[in-house]
Amino acid sequence: IVDYCPAGCR
């Protein structure tokens, strides 16, 4: 599963 805004997003 993958989100549009990964952990690199704040």
From Swiss-Prot:
Keyword Secreted: yes
UniProt keyword annotations, A-Z: Cell wall, Secreted
Compartments reported by the entry: Secreted, Cell wall
GO cellular component: extracellular region
Principal localisation: secreted
Protein name in the entry: Blight-associated protein p12
Source species of the chain: Cycas revoluta
